[in-house]
C-alpha cells in the first residue's frame, strides 16, 4: 500500500516552505490534519526523509482533544457512514436516517456556528456578577466599570484572559484607593475609641489596627473572592446549556413556523445531542462546537499556535470544521487538498469548492488549482472510474474534475460474473495467486461495507492465512493482502484491487454508492479485478461483462 498523489505534494510543499523561508517558519509551526491513523503512519515515515520530522500531525479528532483538554468518547468517524450504507441496503434509508443526515448537515454548517455566537454574546453580557467590587462597605469599582472592561476594553481576548486582565485592573485600583480606605479606617478608629478607656479602648484600637494591616496583606484574597463569584463552566457544560436553554427558544424567533422541516431537524438535533451528552457520548459533528466554545471561553495552549496547516481529504469536512480551524489557529495560511468525487461523508462535507472558498476565504487571496493528470493508475482503470462517477446527477457532476490518466497499459482490468459466493471466494483466491506470481506486493479486496468484508475474511481464511481485515482502528499496514471496506480505502493505493461484489444489490444508482464504487476503483494502481454475482450494478459501464 502507498499513500501518494495529493498528500505527497503537500508534504513536499511543507519541506519547500521550511527550507525557503527558514527565518519565518519552523517545522513545529506546521500542522497536518490527516483523516486517519494510516495517513499519520505514512506521514511520520516520510517526513524524516524530507528533513521536517518536527511537523505536528493530528487527526481532526485528536486535535480537538488537544484543544478541549480531554479525550472524549466518540464513535469511529465512519460509524455514521456505515449506518447509512446498511440502511440503504435494507431499503429503509428514508425512514431511518434522513433526519440523521440533516442533523449532521446543520451541525456542520456556518448557520449552527452563528447560533453559538449569539449564545456566547448572551453569556458575555451576563458573565460579570451584577455587584460592585467592595472592601467591606468601601467601593473600589462599580459593576458598570468592570463590565465595560469585560465587554469592550478587553474584548479581543477569550473570557478567561479578560478576567486575568480585570484582575490586574482591580489590583491597580485597590492599591490606588487603599490609602483612602486606610485613612477612613483611622478616622473611624479615632471616633470609636474617643469615649473609651482602659482595656476596652485597647481592644477596639487593636481591632481597627489589625484590619488596616490586613488590607495590604490580603488584597489578593479580596480580589480572588470577588472574581470567584463568577460561575464558570467547561465547554461541555456551556454546550449543554446552549442546547437546553438557548437554542430552541431563539431559533423559533428566526424560523418561520411554516418551515416545519427545519424545526423538526432542530428539535431532533437538540434531543439527540442532549441524550448523548447525558451518557457522556459525542458525535464527530460535536467537536467543532466544543472546540469553538473552548477557544472563546478559555482559549488554547500555546503549543496549538500554528503558522501553516495542511488539511488532507478536505472534502469530508464541513464549513464549521474549517472555520474553527481557521479561528483557533489564527491563520489563513492553509494547503487544502480534496476530491469531491471521493466525498463519501456527503452529509457534512464540501460539495462545491467555489462556494467553500467564498464562505471561508472571501477576505484573503486564494490560489485554486486542479490536479487532473494522474500518473498512478492506468487509462483503462481511470476510464471505468470516470464512467462510474458520471452517474452522479448533473448538479453534483459540475463541481467534479475527472482524472486524465497518463499511463496507457493494456489488460489492467479483469471482470467476471459469478453464480454464487462460494465461486466468488474461489475466484478471489485465484486472482491473488496470479497477482503475487507477477510480483505485486500490495493487494486489496474491497467490499462495500464492514459486514461484507467480515464475511469475505471469514470465508477466505479457510483457504489462506495471509489476509488481514482492516477495520479502521489500525495504525499501520506494510503491504500484503487486506480486506478493506470501500470508505476506509479512501486515500490509499494498492498495486492490485479486487472489488469483491459489484452487483446490483450492493451498488445502486445513488450518490453514496456511486462515490463508494469510484473510490474502490481508483485505489488500483496496476490491476483492477471486478467481480459480481447475479447481475452487475447499473452504475458500472457496459463494457464490464
Give the role of each language-model region.
Residues 18-310, 316-324, 332, 366:
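Alpha-helical nucleic-acid-binding subdomain
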Residues 2-3:
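The conserved Walker
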Residues 28, 37, 44-45, 49-53, ...:
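Conserved helicase motor core of SF1/SF2 NTP-dependent helicases
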Residues 9, 13:
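Hydrophobic positions on the alpha1 helix immediately C-terminal to the Walker A/P-loop
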